[in-house]
Amino acid sequence: MDADEGQDMSQVSGKESPPVSDTPDEGDEPMPIPEDLSTTSGGQQSSKSDRVVASNVKVETQSDEENGRACEMNGEECAEDLRMLDASGEKMNGSHRDQGSSALSGVGGIRLPNGKLKCDICGIICIGPNVLMVHKRSHTGERPFQCNQCGASFTQKGNLLRHIKLHSGEKPFKCHLCNYACRRRDALTGHLRTHSVGKPHKCGYCGRSYKQRSSLEEHKERCHNYLESMGLPGTLYPVIKEETNHSEMAEDLCKIGSERSLVLDRLASNVAKRKSSMPQKFLGDKGLSDTPYDSSASYEKENEMMKSHVMDQAINNAINYLGAESLRPLVQTPPGGSEVVPVISPMYQLHKPLAEGTPRSNHSAQDSAVENLLLLSKAKLVPSEREASPSNSCQDSTDTESNNEEQRSGLIYLTNHIAPHARNGLSLKEEHRAYDLLRAASENSQDALRVVSTSGEQMKVYKCEHCRVLFLDHVMYTIHMGCHGFRDPFECNMCGYHSQDRYEFSSHITRGEHRFHMS
């Protein structure tokens, strides 16, 4: 017994450095505690017994840490590590636990009636002696585990092993779905969430979902503060529990009309895809000066504050602008009519002009194209639209028509004989606008507009004559046309802002500074 005590005392005094290797020494076992420490006489013998207790706890801690506790841990590493370290203390028999409680003076803890230990310095409650011992190192400054390469010291061996991987560059944790590798297990766990499909964490204020709870908590703080600054109620959406069955959600979605739900899904998905290039800032009556805005923040955080009813309004405007019939795929026109760009806009009640003596072409293909195409020309032309602007050179790059053609014609619309009830616009008499109905088929092939892909195939394009921008996707064109006002094409259909020309209108839509009057 004296030899064993001498060996333990030499280990406590620092003659033998703590092991830093990854292989645990399974042969080391905790030293037995003397049966009756209270009857020990003499200060020297009492000091020896205290050192034996401390050495015993330390050996148990080292063996526990070496048996797989050197895994990667982040912000929750201390709590998790301490709980696992205390598992060995729970395996002690009753007499051993009683003897350890009487010798807590070496650890510096106070045994509570519920069996837990209380730190005599700060009062924190620990679940076992191992946890208390690691906690006491934060007070004493003891760092027994030291790196032999740079000299950095740590309170736990798991932290040392993780630090050693910085020198070796080892990344043992690898993703089985991609080439991602990391040094920490928790980092791999967080990375695997990016491959998952579901987003179980949902905000009760705006309904946005997240994959991680931490992202939801950050969003809730921003979203709730924004709603309070706008004077809106604390909850715009009913709080949906995370354990909501997916089948119930699917049944609720089926209640929506098939055609409307399909359109909304298509439009919403396209809006989400282009959110990174079109930041939206929605402001209330307080104005720009009263609403703080961080220009360095990404759009992902800014767009989270956008309320869902605002997006629904924009989507509904696009549907009302083009009508349900126009959202269906267009009927392919004959080859003879492919010269004219098909552009949809049933905004006005159009009627086919019945002019007497109108010469007709001998080709039936051109006749069908003339019947389906009507040209609307504005009586008032804005000369400033032709002025070049350095900041809008990208829009001018899509202009392929001549100046004479622009002054001669304004907007080309493909009606496809849509019934008047399918359109949601206003008639010409109600608008009091002087539009002339002209022929759309141009006999000059130089006025034709064609877009050819890299493979040489002709692509179908949709052109907004208000902004003179081409779209290769019909849904994107539909969303864009929904931004134009019903009465004035340069009036924002979301907030009512009036622009002077297409440049100002495009800048307003791109910046997304929509001002809404909320009651």
From Swiss-Prot:
- Cite the Pfam families for this sequence: zf-C2H2 (PF00096)
Q: How does it assemble?
A: Heterodimer formed by the various isoforms; this modulates transcription regulator activity. Heterodimer with other IKAROS family members. Interacts with IKZF4 AND IKZF5. Component of the chromatin-remodeling NuRD repressor complex which includes at least HDAC1, HDAC2, RBBP4, RBBP7, IKZF1, MTA2, MBD2, MBD3, MTA1L1, CHD3 and CHD4. Interacts directly with the CHD4 component of the NuRD complex. Interacts directly with SMARCA4; the interaction associates IKFZ1 with the BAF complex. Interacts with SUMO1; the interaction sumoylates IKAROS, promoted by PIAS2 and PIAS3.
* Any one GO cellular component localisation term in the record: nucleoplasm
Location of this chain's protein in the cell? Nucleus
Give the molecular function GO annotations.
DNA binding; DNA-binding transcription factor activity; identical protein binding; protein domain specific binding; RNA polymerase II cis-regulatory region sequence-specific DNA binding; zinc ion binding
Summarizing the annotation, the consequence of altering Y210C is: In CVID13; decreases binding to pericentromeric heterochromatin DNA; has diffuse nuclear localization
Could you say which residues are annotated as the site Required for both pericentromeric heterochromatin localization and DNA binding?
A: L188
Name the associated disease, please: Defects in IKZF1 are frequent occurrences (28.6%) in acute lymphoblasic leukemia (ALL). Such alterations or deletions lead to poor prognosis for ALL. Chromosomal aberrations involving IKZF1 are a cause of B-cell non-Hodgkin lymphomas (B-cell NHL). Translocation t(3;7)(q27;p12), with BCL6.
Per the entry, what this protein does is:
Transcription regulator of hematopoietic cell differentiation. Binds gamma-satellite DNA. Plays a role in the development of lymphocytes, B- and T-cells. Binds and activates the enhancer (delta-A element) of the CD3-delta gene. Repressor of the TDT (fikzfterminal deoxynucleotidyltransferase) gene during thymocyte differentiation. Regulates transcription through association with both HDAC-dependent and HDAC-independent complexes. Targets the 2 chromatin-remodeling complexes, NuRD and BAF (SWI/SNF), in a single complex (PYR complex), to the beta-globin locus in adult erythrocytes.
Name of the molecule in the record: DNA-binding protein Ikaros
Q: Which InterPro entries match?
A: Ikaros_C2H2-ZF, Znf_C2H2_sf, Znf_C2H2_type
Supply the PANTHER family for this chain: DNA-BINDING PROTEIN IKAROS (PTHR24404:SF36), ZINC FINGER PROTEIN (PTHR24404)
> Which PROSITE patterns has this protein been placed in?
ZINC_FINGER_C2H2_1, ZINC_FINGER_C2H2_2
Q: Annotated region Disordered: where?
A: 1-72, 381-406
Q: Which organism is it from?
A: Homo sapiens
Q: What's the PTM story here?
A: Phosphorylation controls cell-cycle progression from late G(1) stage to S stage. Hyperphosphorylated during G2/M phase. Dephosphorylated state during late G(1) phase. Phosphorylation on Thr-140 is required for DNA and pericentromeric location during mitosis. CK2 is the main kinase, in vitro. GSK3 and CDK may also contribute to phosphorylation of the C-terminal serine and threonine residues. Phosphorylation on these C-terminal residues reduces the DNA-binding ability. Phosphorylation/dephosphorylation events on Ser-13 and Ser-295 regulate TDT expression during thymocyte differentiation. Sumoylated. Simultaneous sumoylation on the 2 sites results in a loss of both HDAC-dependent and HDAC-independent repression. Has no effect on pericentromeric heterochromatin location. Desumoylated by SENP1.
The tissues where this chain's protein is expressed are given as: Abundantly expressed in thymus, spleen and peripheral blood Leukocytes and lymph nodes. Lower expression in bone marrow and small intestine.
| Family affiliation | Belongs to the Ikaros C2H2-type zinc-finger protein family.
Which residues are tagged with the site Required for both pericentromeric heterochromatin localization and complete DNA binding? N159, R162
Here the cross-link named Glycyl lysine isopeptide (Lys-Gly) (interchain with G-Cter in SUMO) sits at K58, K241
For the modification Phosphoserine, which residues carry it? 13, 63, 101, 168, 196, 258, 261, 289, 295, 298, 361, 364, 368, 389, 391, 393, 397, 402, 427, 445
The zinc fingers classed as C2H2-type run over 117-139, 145-167, 173-195, 201-224, 462-484, 490-514
Q: Where is the composition biased (Low complexity)?
A: 38-47
Q: Which residues carry this modification: Phosphothreonine?
A: T23, T140, T398
The region called Required for both high-affinity DNA binding and pericentromeric heterochromatin localization is annotated at 154-163, 180-195
* Gene Ontology BP terms: chromatin organization; erythrocyte differentiation; lymphocyte differentiation; mesoderm development; negative regulation of DNA-templated transcription; regulation of transcription by RNA polymerase II
